[in-house]
Amino acid sequence: MKNILKISISVALLSFGLNLSAAEDYSKLDVKKECDVKTNGVEKVIQTAEKYNKIAIEHGVEFMRFGMKNSQYIDASKEAIKSGAKEIELLDEKAKPTGEKVSIEFATWRACSFAISALTQEAQANK
């Protein structure tokens, strides 16, 4: 019984330490490097955006710009990649098209930079 307790405490402390160190890594992320569409390609950048936006949502810090959540930028970019479209249409706070369009590269870069910026700003605020 004591061994189970020791193992449980060890696992809990290790998990806490890993989570704490992972949070510190967010402040060191380089948006320009991670979100460079020309260097990394649209698909890789959108995967990066998805990865970090998922964490931002879990932390409750997802970016929103002009009523459009970052997850909507990601979804629209993924849909455009699938369909081969060159542009996505921006949405308002009611998820209705605004009539304004942006290139897939810009939308992907924006989604990635918003996802990472949400986490870096959160990490800086917690210091």
Task: Please place each PLM-identified region on the residue numbering.
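Classic N-terminal secretory signal peptides
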Residues: 1-23
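Long, charged/polar, soluble alpha-helical segments
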Residues: 21-127
